[in-house]
Amino acid sequence: MISTLLVGFGFSATTFHLPFLNYLPQFSVDVVISSKPDVVNAVLPHAEVYGSLEEALKIHDVDLVVITTPNHLHGPQAKLALEHSCHVLVEKPFTLDSEEAEALVELAHSQNKQLCVYHNRRFDGDFLTIKQLINDGKLGDIKRLESRFDRFRPVPRDRWRE
């Protein structure tokens, strides 16, 4: 059984990660970092909920840490998890700069741990189709591709991430 700690319990955690973690029998979501323990316990009554990753890692020996927090926290939280000998799956963007990313890759290698960036749409049909068209040369010599995706909403909401 792979003991898993989920950092954050918002849209990404509950939509992209938790369904897989709950479905696959080799994973057990034992610890969650969230500011809303009542929301977590309604979905995962067996999970222990903490307000900080530092606090949870002092108490629990987990195998995997899944990071679904705001972007600026990804790097520091991945580092902390690796320093506690955990495998890490982190939402995109991995880090805010390449130096931090390279340091984390080196740390993971030195700890002999897996460090993976999660791209939730990597294997979606639309992206696979574009990849195939490019590989087949049907779109010519592409120099740049710009793509926008707004969750199928005709009008974007007024939020800091959007």
Regions found by a protein language model. Give the residues of each.
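Short, Asp-centered acidic motifs that coordinate Mg2+ and/or phosphate
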Residues: V31, L64, R144
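Predominantly a Rossmann-like dinucleotide-binding segment in NAD(P)-dependent oxidoreductases
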Residues: R122-E162
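Structural signature of beta-strand start/N-cap positions in the alpha/beta core
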Residues: S3, S28, D61-L64, H87, ...
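Beta-loop-alpha module in the N-terminal Rossmann-like domain of NAD(P)-dependent dehydrogenases
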Residues: A47-L107
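Acidic-histidine catalytic/liganding microenvironments
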Residues: L24, L44, I59-H60, D124
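Rossmann-fold dehydrogenase core element
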Residues: A103-N120, D141-L145
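N-terminal Rossmann-like dinucleotide-binding module
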Residues: M1-L44
